[in-house]
């Protein structure tokens, strides 16, 4: 049995999985009928896995969001997009591999798709810069969004980054300016924009393609202003305090839904999207098509106004004695 990537909180399942594999080998090598015993163990393992993943802490959800086999932007595109054509370059001499984009069809509907792309192993992660886009990546994304706006193509973005690349060269090339321009221009787009946090949604790197009419996120994805490790280092001068920081930052789907930051939290199979990627793809496609049907019925001025109001409603400062919730109506 090939060893799979295990989280510490999944260790209680190891013994059960070993028993299941032993029974499968026994069934292959003998005439003994073990189907009933195998079914019982598989049912027990599935139930325990579901119990474990329903009780994950914010710090544990971060681990799931960073799983190396979690479906990536290109994985989702291959699952539900027809006639995908990747488009390259920012027309300023750069073609960032940490942020990919192109045109394709979902059913009969043509769309533009943009997303962060991590690697599966060290070599690929180095090539993709661990999903941390450079200024060239955000300028490429803006070029493609301008293209979509011109040809009236709905825009779908997939967020999965620990943050924008913060190296010296990125700063020299105007990382902050590139992200800021994207924020400004995305508010002006005349087409529907749907963003989905498929893994990590970290800081300005996520916001650079995250100004959307609908913001979705998967159940075990995270969306945060800073990584818990960075937050703990800043506040407590101790990265070991990351679990406490993760809880305080309100980075999980239910918290963000309650705060009015995200519009829908998409369910994941027990074990996370890496456990059943095709099922995750079906869930995401259904949600995208449903929200597109709603947004395409709006006029351009209605779309822009709703997008503006959505973001203006975030981050209100309230008087402690006020009975207001600060949530959008």
Swiss-Prot record:
GO terms for cellular component: acetyl-CoA carboxylase complex. GO terms for biological process: fatty acid biosynthetic process; malonyl-CoA biosynthetic process. It comes from the Bacteria. It is found in: Cytoplasm. Component of the acetyl coenzyme A carboxylase (ACC) complex. First, biotin carboxylase catalyzes the carboxylation of biotin on its carrier protein (BCCP) and then the CO(2) group is transferred by the carboxyltransferase to acetyl-CoA to form malonyl-CoA. GO terms for molecular function: acetyl-CoA carboxylase activity; ATP binding; carboxyl- or carbamoyltransferase activity. Pathway: Lipid metabolism; malonyl-CoA biosynthesis; malonyl-CoA from acetyl-CoA: step 1/1. The keyword Lipid biosynthesis applies. The keyword Lipid biosynthesis applies. Keywords: ATP-binding, Cytoplasm, Fatty acid biosynthesis, Fatty acid metabolism, Lipid biosynthesis, Lipid metabolism, Nucleotide-binding, Transferase. Residues 40-294 form the CoA carboxyltransferase C-terminal domain. It comes from Prochlorococcus marinus (strain MIT 9313). Acetyl-CoA carboxylase is a heterohexamer composed of biotin carboxyl carrier protein (AccB), biotin carboxylase (AccC) and two subunits each of ACCase subunit alpha (AccA) and ACCase subunit beta (AccD). It is an enzyme of class 2 (transferase). This is Acetyl-coenzyme A carboxylase carboxyl transferase subunit alpha.
């Amino acid at each position: 049995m090939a060893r799979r990537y295990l989280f510490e909180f999944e260790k209680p399942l190891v013994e059960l999985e070993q028993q299941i594999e032993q029974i499968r080998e026994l069934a292959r090598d003998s005439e003994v009928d073990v189907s009933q015993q195998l079914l019982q163990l598989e049912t027990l393992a599935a139930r325990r896995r579901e119990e474990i993943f329903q009780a994950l802490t914010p710090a544990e959800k971060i681990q799931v969001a960073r799983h190396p086999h979690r479906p990536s932007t290109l994985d989702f595109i291959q699952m539900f997009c027809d006639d995908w054509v990747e488009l390259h370059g920012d027309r300023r001499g750069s073609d960032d591999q940490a942020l990919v984009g192109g045109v394709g069809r979902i059913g009969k509907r043509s769309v533009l798709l943009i997303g962060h792309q991590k690697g599966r192993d060290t070599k690929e992660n180095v090539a993709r810069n661990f999903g941390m886009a450079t200024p060239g990546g955000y300028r490429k994304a803006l070029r493609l969004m301008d293209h979509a706006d011109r040809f009236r193509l709905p825009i779908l973005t997939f967020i999965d980054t620990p943050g924008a690349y913060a190296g010296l060269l990125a700063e020299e090339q105007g990382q902050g300016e590139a992200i800021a321009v994207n924020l400004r221009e995305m508010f002006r787009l005349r087409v529907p924009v749907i963003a989905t946090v498929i893994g990590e949604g970290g800081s300005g790197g996520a916001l650079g393609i995250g100004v959307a009419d609908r913001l979705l996120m998967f159940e075990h994805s995270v969306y945060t202003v800073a990584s818990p490790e960075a937050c703990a280092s800043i506040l407590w001068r101790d990265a070991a305090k990351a679990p406490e920081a993760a809880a305080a930052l309100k980075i999980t789907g239910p918290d963000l839904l309650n705060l009015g930051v995200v519009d829908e939290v998409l369910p994941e199979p027990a074990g996370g999207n890496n456990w059943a990627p095709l099922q995750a793809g079906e869930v995401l496609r259904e949600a995208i098509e449903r929200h597109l049907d709603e947004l395409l019925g709006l006029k351009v001025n209605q779309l822009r106004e709703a997008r503006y109001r959505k973001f203006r409603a975030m981050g209100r400062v309230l008087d402690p004695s006020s009975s207001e919730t600060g949530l959008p109506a």
